[in-house]
């Protein structure tokens, strides 16, 4: 059985953001605006997304 995945897209810049939030974006694998990645839907990933929710768009 395949694990459920989610698509995460960075929609706002990381310039002038908290260092912790920049690090969270890097941890998610996002590098630039409109960069989209597909991640496995886990509680840890969801927590990271919640922390930077104002900078990313999530598609189920």
Swiss-Prot record:
InterPro entries: Ribo_uL30_ferredoxin-like_sf, Ribosomal_uL30_bac-type, Ribosomal_uL30_CS, Ribosomal_uL30_ferredoxin-like. One of its GO terms (biological process) is translation. PROSITE patterns: RIBOSOMAL_L30. GO terms for cellular component: cytosolic large ribosomal subunit. Keywords: Ribonucleoprotein, Ribosomal protein. The keyword Ribonucleoprotein applies. It comes from the Bacteria. Transmembrane segments: none annotated. PANTHER family: LARGE RIBOSOMAL SUBUNIT PROTEIN UL30M, MITOCHONDRIAL RIBOSOMAL PROTEIN L30. Belongs to the universal ribosomal protein uL30 family. Part of the 50S ribosomal subunit. This is Large ribosomal subunit protein uL30.
